[in-house]
Amino acid sequence: MFFNPYLSGARKPPNLVAKRSVAKTFLEIVPRGAMHDGQSGLIKHKTGRGAIMFYRDIKHVLENDMAWPCPLPAPPPSIEAFARRLMGPLKFHTYDQVDGVLTHDTQECLSPRYRHHITPSGNVLRFFGATEQGHSICVNVFGQRSYFYCEYADGDLLRDLLASVSDLVSEPRMAYALTITPVQKMSIYGYGTSPIPNLFRVSISNWSMAKKIGEYLLENGIPVYEIRVDPLTRLVIDKKMTTFGWCCVHRYEWRTHKSSTCDFEIDCDVADIMAVSDDTSWPVYRCLSFDIECMSASGGFPAAEQTDDIVIQISCVCYNTGGTGCEENTVFGTSGLHLFTIGSCAPLAGVDVYEFPSEYEMLLGFLIFFQRYSPCFVTGYNINSFDFKYILTRLEFVYKLSPGPYSKLPAQGRFSMYSPLKKFVTTTTTKVFISGTVVIDMYPVCMAKTSSPNYKLNTMAELYLKQQKEDMSYKDIPVKFISGCEGRAQVGKYCVQDAVLVKDLFNTINFHYEAGAIARLARIPMRRVIFDGQQIRIYTSLLDECACRDFIMPNHKGADNSSEPTDVSYQGATVFEPEVGYYSDPVVVFDFASLYPSIIMAHNLCYSTFVAPGGESPPESDVLTVELESGLSYRFVKNTVRNSVLSELLTKWVSQRRAVRETMRSCHDPVKRMLLDKEQLALKVTCNAFYGFTGVVNGMMPCLPIAASITRIGRDMLMRTSQFVEENFAEPCFLHNFFNREDYSGDPVAVKVIYGDTDSVFVCYRGVTAAALIERGPSLAHYITQCLFVDPIKLEFEKVFGSLMMICKKRYIGKIVGETELSMKGVDLVRKTSCEFVKNVTRDIIQLLFDDPEVSRAAVQLSRLTLDELKMQGVPPGFGRVIQRLSQARDELYTSRARVEELVLSSVLSKDVSLYKQSNLPHIAVIKRLAARSEELPVVGDRVFYVLTAPVDGRSSGVRNYEIAEDPTYVREHGVPIHADKYFDQVIKSVTNVLSPVFPPQTLRKDKFLLGILPHRIYLEPSFLPYCVKASEHC
């Protein structure tokens, strides 16, 4: 069919940005207090006056093409002037990419040179970035086909099949260009030396149609490969391009009628773009941090779906990131601080304040501002699940205004949010997509980067910035807002403060540099690094390696489908139960460096080396067989037959990380050093993700034989290490080779491995000083490595515990030699669910055990007593200090001297309240009580805090926690008494968990034993106190 690209006036299309206009009629919602100070309620009516705003008392009509009134940086040069400065190819840095589909009748002003790529329809890949001169640019790349592989008997028959399938897939359906080519490729899944028979590459010009057709073939049992690989991934792999870094375009044409809002826009062919691989520097990019304040008509916490729950203020902070630090600091506005508010507002120092008559006009003004400023990165705190969600919901449901045209692609852009309704939904699964802008919510970033009892902005500001925010209750915000312009200024100051704090967090944590490094390494867009987890990183990297080796990657029906049954299970790497007890002799800890990656490399494990049942089978001498404890066995060819793709990829990245770290040592430029550090961190994180990629049954390409073999080999390595240590480390010859006479403590030398878990070995070394073990530790680790393992597996010396309490598997407390703080794992002190009171009591008792020699000796003595001996001799005297601390804690609880703040418990709200099937959970009960009182409600991902209160009916037992759980603020403000029995029971359990190794071995109920050695006391109700006298008055 012939397509004339110039029909319908496509030669000179209109300017897509300037053509749009703002609706003159809209719903006006205004708080009464914005017009009449102090009055509550809303004014709502339709108006046709047109949208306006006021800036410095000057009225401005809101139009999409309006000049923004605040002070602005100098505009970019004209296309002609800029083009004259360029000599040769155009170099630009890309940070974001968007794929799309254009048809032959597109309204975009496209040169005839590129029109054949979209006839009848074709992919366009838009690379957003910045030029070397710092100007924003959009590079439209044409000619990248979508393709996948398909097994079929005949190419002509396959073409007929695809033609019929094209009419069966879901709407919208479009015409496309199709090419079918026979190819010689092998599947990476399973060892084999023969290409896949009757294999064709199906190349389709339209990604939307290619995806639908591929999925249809897969669902109908036709063998297909790589059907979910999008055209952007095809380009970066086929061309060895980058998704985050510097690129070069050799031949291109300037767009005079742009489809984007960037300073400049060019079109090019896919053959004319390439990456500049050596340069990892950043240009200057624009960033925006924002925050919103809302007001509920009901007085409760606002809900966006409620028409009367409006946004009243929006704060924005404009700033730059990247660059070398030598660039001129351009400011958008007076100082980069902006406040959008309904109603008049008193001036705020250094803040550009925009006043709007209604919510609609304020939201519209924010969207126009957003597009004028055109940020490359936007950040905030919980903006994915609240701020963006709130604004987008208001625009869609209340005002019927599409925000897409306010992205960097006014005609085809997206400005949307996606919240999948799954069983376990957290804030990190809420995705915000803005064409040309990368969204980095600092709330999930902080949750991933640190362990904290809560992740409120104030807590993170204290942790990272050593700052405290001036807090304002959501209940106070409406009161101040409607009080007058001064009150609105107070709310505005609070709103701006939050956006500034997030900007400082953004620049302190520097997650954007880390995400950029991962994007460059894994060849995926930066937004996918942020939102899509580890699987896509490994999949794309593996796809890249396959392309170099004529391998292709298979697809499976659904996430659960793999070549192995999903009920295949394998045991983790914990080797043996620990020798529980208190150790006063030194305990040496050895760790395997990068255990799982090194196992893959050392043993040539891979999809491509796995000998599948019924497949090609080389001689047994060329095969590694891994026997599982279940009786199953898996076989892999050795590297003499075929090198593992996973191994080669890991080897390359490990070497690359070593080189980067070496470069860091001699780098004195702080910016370059920070970029290098993020690069080596990206390499480390991605290397460690390989094991999870193969072991997740519902992952993108699971292979349980690989995952099970890795864990089995890891278990065997720990067992061999344990056996080797116990057989050799106490032998006279060994001791003579490694230790001198002064290294011995005087006790008989005895060596015992007391624990082995995943990648660590704990060795109790009696008779040798801790100082000697620290000095000789690296040599001991090197000796084990040489004797037992092959490269690159390496055992490393980590630390020496001077004393250690081994409680049970994955739980221990110890004091590392040379450090003052205790090292803990798995105990209540490091659990976020425990209250501070319990932690403090437990911590005090642990400190007594490790710091007080008398208590330590008493603990060892107690652990060696039988129950009969204990009845005769009593508890060792030194243990009395532990009993005294427990008695003190009991007194504080039963006499109401414990502070409410110390008694707060918490649980994570992991999904929406409506999705919980159990109603008898304390944190859910608290949320329901908060809702009944119209209090501020936590969002998904938050920790919900509560206190256990005394039951109103006076019951002391049989009370469930959810019946007495209450909000801490409510308890404090209303003086609600606490449930002392519940809290002291937690104290006893926590201390028992820590001290149980020192209790007599025959003790069955260790918590009962601990309660039994405490002195008995009776606590009277407060009403009896007037009738009591002090003991001293009887004397």
UniProtKB/Swiss-Prot annotation:
The keyword Cell cycle does not apply. This is DNA polymerase catalytic subunit. The gene is UL54. GO terms for molecular function: DNA binding; DNA-directed DNA polymerase activity; nucleotide binding. It comes from Rhesus cytomegalovirus (strain 68-1) (RhCMV). InterPro entries: DNA-dir_DNA_pol_B, DNA-dir_DNA_pol_B_CS, DNA-dir_DNA_pol_B_exonuc, DNA-dir_DNA_pol_B_multi_dom, DNA/RNA_pol_sf, DNA_pol_B_thumb, DNA_pol_palm_dom_sf, DNA_pol_type-B. The lineage of its organism: Viruses, Duplodnaviria, Heunggongvirae, Peploviricota, Herviviricetes. Keywords: DNA replication, DNA-binding, DNA-directed DNA polymerase, Host nucleus, Nucleotidyltransferase, Transferase, Viral DNA replication. Pfam families: DNA_pol_B, DNA_pol_B_exo1. GO terms for cellular component: host cell nucleus.
